[in-house]
């Protein structure tokens, strides 16, 4: 079970990194329409953090509140495109990691919240791609 909580905490850290990257993207974006899309997706990621933290607590673990260093790196001359590319890479990583965990027997009661986090990321990937083209 502790291995499962550890894996979920890694996903939560990645989710926090998404929130951080989207905050940077909001400040880099000059287009009000695109800025609203970024803001909405950032709020979804914040909700995902709460959902993941609740799953971790339900499994008897303690949720992390530190963003993943792997996805939190900031380039010195980072453009909006760079930030959003890193964010989308993180989103896809989260989708894949949750997919790998959904069949775990110990996660039976947490499948719905995890599937919802996964689904929100899939929708946000499509939403962001359509808004940025």
Give each language-model segment a name.
Residues 65-72, 97-115:
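Long amphipathic alpha-helical coiled-coil segments
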Residues 33, 47, 93, 109, ...:
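Short alpha-helical
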Residues 4, 34-37, 80, 106-110:
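Residue-level recognition of alpha-helical structural elements
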Residues 32-67, 127-133:
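Conserved alpha-helical segments that form or flank metal/cofactor-binding pockets of metalloenzymes
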Residues 1-29, 81-105, 119, 123, ...:
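Alpha-helical bundle segments that constitute or directly flank the non-heme di-iron/ferroxidase center
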Residues 50-96:
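Carboxylate-rich helix-loop segments that flank metal/cofactor sites and access channels
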Residues 24, 31, 71-75:
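A short small-residue
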């Amino acid at each position: 079970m502790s291995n499962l909580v550890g894996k979920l905490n890694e996903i939560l850290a990645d989710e926090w990194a998404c929130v951080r990257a989207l905050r940077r993207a909001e400040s880099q974006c000059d287009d009000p329409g695109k800025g609203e899309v970024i803001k909405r997706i950032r709020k979804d990621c914040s909700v995902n953090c709460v959902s993941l933290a609740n799953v971790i607590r339900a499994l008897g673990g303690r949720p992390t509140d530190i963003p993943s260093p792997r996805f939190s790196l900031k380039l010195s001359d980072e453009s909006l495109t760079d930030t959003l590319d890193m964010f989308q890479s993180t989103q896809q990583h989260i989708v894949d990691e949750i997919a790998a965990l959904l069949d775990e027997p110990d996660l039976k009661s947490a499948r719905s919240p995890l599937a919802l986090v996964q689904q929100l990321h899939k929708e946000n990937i499509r939403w962001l791609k359509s808004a940025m083209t």
